[in-house]
Every structure is written in C-alpha cells, then in structure tokens.
Amino acid sequence: MEFVEFEQLVGPAEYAPSPVDWNLLESRLGLRLPRDYRQLFQRYPNLQIDKFLGIFAPNSDVDEQLRLIDDAMEPLRELAGVQVALIDDNGEEAMVPRFPFYPEPGGLLDWGATENGDRCLWLTENEDSEKWPIIITDGIQYWRYDGNIISFVGGLLDRAIICPIFPRRFPSSSRIDQFAVEA
C-alpha cells in the first residue's frame, strides 16, 4: 500500500498533527526514522486501527518522547532472557537470541501498542531505516514483518497480513480513528 492509498482510507486530518522537530528528534535518537512514519505524522495525529492498534505520533517535546520510548521498552527489557520465542506466520516458535533494545545498536524501537499491551516496534538493525523490519511482541513471543508501517497496516486491513500475536478476528473492520492527546 502506498501512502496516497492510506490517506484515502483515513480521510482528511481531523486534528492538527503535533508539531515535531524531526531533525532534533532524529539527532537525539541517533537514528533517521522511516519516511512513511514521518509522512504519517506530518499529516495526522495519533491513529487507532479498529479500536485496537494504536500508532502514536512523536511528542513535540523531544526529552519527553525519549522518556516515553524508554518507559515503553522497560517491561520488555525485564522480560527478555538470553533467548526469545520468534514465531512465524503460522505461530510456529523458534528460540533465537534476544533482540537488542534501543539505544543499543540495532535495537528495538517503539512506535505503537495494542489494547492488549502488545508492543509494535522497529528492529533498527540496518542503517537504512526504510529497511527496518517491524517486530510485534506480547513480551513473550515476537513476530517479524519485513515492510513499513503503511504496508503493514494496509495488509492488516485487507487481511493479507495476519499477525499471530494479534487476536484472530483483528481487524473486524477497516475503521481508523484519529485522536489527539492533550499536552
């Protein structure tokens, strides 16, 4: 799915996106964020897919954003052992070395969450952020998708992608809500 197609699904912005100093944020992160993510939140506020999957805009306060990322990652750091269970599209499990966590080089970086507490992450293993895979985890099992956020969400909505960590019936609709968070 291309960004233009995604915009047609979501419709016009209902709220102004948060003003984000992308250069400052990326400088402080030490990472260039994926283009589709920047496009998404230059156009929209936070998004929620089928009242379940939240995709969060960066906070305009960069220090606060870095704290939010760290807070989101802390439970995963505590749960991860030396190995983690990586599952395939059929739910088959293989034990693999645990993923590093941001700010470790190539670490997992948070971009969203579900109502069940699952985390949506990038694996920042490549210098080219356009090649970062998406990792979905419930804290115990991890699942990998090789593609960007727009293609991931588009694939979920048309049921071309089934994430085995998400409920089987998700999504039950193609509803995408926009919401702003009060500062």
List where the protein language model places each region.
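Acidic surface patches and DE-rich sequence motifs
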Residues: 114, 126, 137-138
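Short polybasic amphipathic segments
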Residues: 131-137
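Compact, glycine/acidic-enriched structural inserts
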Residues: 142-165
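Acidic, carboxylate-rich catalytic segments that either coordinate divalent cations
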Residues: 161-169, 173-182
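Short, surface-exposed beta-strand/loop micro-motifs that present aromatic residues
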Residues: 119-126
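A surface-exposed partner-binding patch
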Residues: 1-116, 181-183
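Short acidic/polar mixed-charge low-complexity motifs
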Residues: 116-119, 141
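Short, solvent-exposed loop/turn segments that connect beta-strands within catalytic domains
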Residues: 61, 127-131
